[in-house]
A protein has these predicted regions:
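A surface-exposed beta-strand-loop module
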Residues: 1-49, 107
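Solvent-exposed beta-hairpin/edge-strand motifs
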Residues: 1-2, 53, 91
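Short acidic, glycine/Ser/Thr-rich loop/turn "cap" segments at secondary-structure junctions
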Residues: 13-14, 66-69
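Short glycine/serine/threonine-biased micro-segments
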Residues: 31, 198, 236
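N-terminal, polar/Ser/Thr-rich
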Residues: 50-56, 76
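Hydrophobic helix-coil surface modules that form long, contiguous segments used
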Residues: 59-64, 71-229, 246-248
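Catalytic Zn2+-binding segment of zinc metalloproteases
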Residues: 232-247
């Protein structure tokens, strides 16, 4: 067969020489891509390391930006499992939707392989690599962790408490507990949206997440609590139960 490429739609249509036979079929594709600074797809954020600027990587794939990162069916009603390995500079923390199965640092590189995801829409796939520190609490069997730059970690306490409260409440409200073994709440210094509900690895803009207990207003705290609760609810509405297309929202 041969591929037809649309630069406008960013799609590839495969024309086959013969009809597909009933049963399983496999498409293999070699590809490469680039990080951008558009804050969609796989994008570059400007972090800090000992006072110097450093490039960090995050993904924002909603609504149809997964196709900027990897060949996939990225319409939300198509769901798949994902197996992911990240190879990043040794000083950075790789994160994704699921917990790490292996974590090896050698020759200045850190290679982390993650557990296979639940079946999910591709717009929820998370790929992060940044200089972040964790702080965790448990809700039942779920480990809830905030990831923030080390110098800002104390400012994530309020959001961590909000996430723990929301997750505990929603587990009881739905009578269908959160499915994944972990829920990460990750801070990015550059992000166009307030937050993105990637399953198991929610991404937040720092201004929508960090609270200084001495300086932040009650209105700022209320806003952070609303954003965190909104994204935790999405772990059920959107992630577990998903619309067929974006006009169903």
């Amino acid at each position: 067969g041969r591929p037809l490429t649309s630069t406008r739609l960013k799609t590839v249509t495969l024309l086959l020489d013969a009809p597909l036979k009933k049963g399983a079929a496999v498409i293999e594709a070699e590809y490469s891509g680039k990080m951008n600074e558009l804050m969609r797809g796989l994008f570059k954020a400007r972090g800090r390391n000992e006072g110097k600027e450093e490039s960090w990587a995050f993904t924002h794939l909603e609504p149809t930006h997964a196709r900027r990162v990897l060949p996939s069916f990225d319409e939300p009603d198509f769901k798949a499992t994902f197996r992911l390995t990240l190879d990043v500079p040794a000083g950075l923390q790789p994160l994704s939707n699921m917990p790490a199965l292996s974590d090896v640092t050698k020759n200045g590189r850190r290679v982390v392989t993650f557990a296979e995801t639940e079946k999910m829409s591709s717009y929820l796939l998370a790929v992060f690599a940044a200089r972040l520190a964790p702080k965790s609490r448990k809700v039942g069997k779920t480990v809830v962790t905030v990831w923030a730059p080390p110098e800002q970690l104390k400012q994530a306490d309020f959001a961590l408490d909000a996430a723990v409260r929301a997750l505990g409440f929603l587990n009881k409200w739905f009578a269908y507990p959160y499915m994944l073994p972990k829920l990460d709440l990750v801070v990015s210094p550059d992000f166009a949206s307030g937050a993105m509900e990637n399953w198991g690895a929610i991404l937040f803009r720092d201004a929508s997440f960090l609270i200084d207990p001495k300086l932040s207003s009650d209105a700022a705290k209320r806003r952070v609590a609303e954003v965190v609760s909104h994204e935790v609810v999405h772990q059920w509405f959107g992630n577990l139960v998903t619309m067929g297309w974006w006009n169903d929202l």
